[in-house]
């Protein structure tokens, strides 16, 4: 995977199969994107696809981890930041400011990508505010087609789903109780 990509030489041809699975809902009127750490990378394309309709709440340990704000700013309405050390934006986690944003904003969807503990917290807060929430799960995937079952997860209804085929985006209530 990553090691093979790092050894590629400019001009080399790479075969890619995709996109696979399901993405975030692009029909939302005013979504709030919540990303933490490296989880900000996968939702950047979603922000671009939403053509200024989305706001973003990003969290990181320090201001240095939130270089993403420069990439998101031209694509989104508002950019809100939280850092563990308070070096940029509000000191704390994304869930520190999320309740206030959901109370004041006119959001019809929350999309989250980042550490699982963050996404669980975001899903809980969104549920408390009766706002639909989707999360993007990360699992090691062997085949990407659903055949090998290496990315299988248990849902809240007891069903088994494959992150590669049925996800990686799920309704939060489907994967977090």
Language-model segment annotations:
Residues 2-5, 23-25, 41, 85, ...:
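Residues at secondary-structure transition points
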Residues 62-177:
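Reductase modules of NAD(P)H-dependent flavoproteins
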